[in-house]
């Protein structure tokens, strides 16, 4: 898991060849002013889901993980807390892995929390369980899906 500011995004380019294209798009477009929806940058290899959601309380946020995609979660409006736990600590599955949606949910609780503000991002790799959307208010965010 990585937490950083968008102004430092170039430091992550070496981690995946698709990161540069994603962050270049984000830098050159005002995502906060766009309507929610899907932005395809490179087919199923790289796309952005723009969402507006009501925040959840920490006790109801579910841990999730992915096997095929890295998540880059960028807060556009509001403030979001995200839970984190190493995937090996996520043992209690709610349901089997959903390959079509590349997601599995767990009842396990995060071992750590981070706060992400507008202009900041969190990268969750396949070894990172995460509980997103923890907030007292409404959040607008971009979820960049990067095929590994």
Please place each PLM-identified region on the residue numbering.
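Short, surface-exposed beta-strand-loop junctions and turns on beta-sheet-rich folds
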Residues: 88-90, 130, 138
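Glycine- and acidic-residue-biased ligand/ion/polar-headgroup-sensing regions
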Residues: 68-70, 74-82, 89-90, 97-103
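A short beta-loop-beta micro-motif enriched in histidine and acidic residues
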Residues: 60-71, 89-93, 109-110
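A short, N-terminal "cap"/entry segment at the start of jelly-roll beta-barrel domains
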Residues: 2-49, 60-65
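Conserved metal-binding segment of the jelly-roll/cupin
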Residues: 114-129
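A short hydrophobic beta-strand segment most commonly corresponding to one strand
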Residues: 121-123, 138-148
């Amino acid at each position: 898991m990585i937490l950083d500011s968008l102004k430092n995004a170039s430091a992550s380019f070496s981690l995946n060849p698709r990161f540069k294209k994603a962050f270049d798009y984000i830098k050159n477009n005002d995502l906060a002013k766009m309507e929610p929806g899907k932005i395809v940058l490179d087919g199923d290899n790289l796309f952005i889901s723009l969402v507006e959601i009501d925040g959840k309380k920490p006790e109801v946020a579910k841990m999730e993980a992915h096997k095929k995609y890295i998540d880059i979660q960028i807060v556009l409006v509001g403030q979001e807390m995200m839970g984190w736990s190493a995937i090996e600590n996520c043992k209690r599955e709610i349901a089997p892995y959903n390959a079509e949606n590349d997601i599995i949910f767990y009842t396990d609780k995060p071992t750590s929390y981070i706060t992400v503000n507008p202009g900041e991002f969190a990268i969750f790799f396949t070894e990172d369980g995460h509980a997103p959307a923890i907030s007292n208010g409404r959040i607008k965010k971009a979820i960049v899906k990067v095929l590994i």
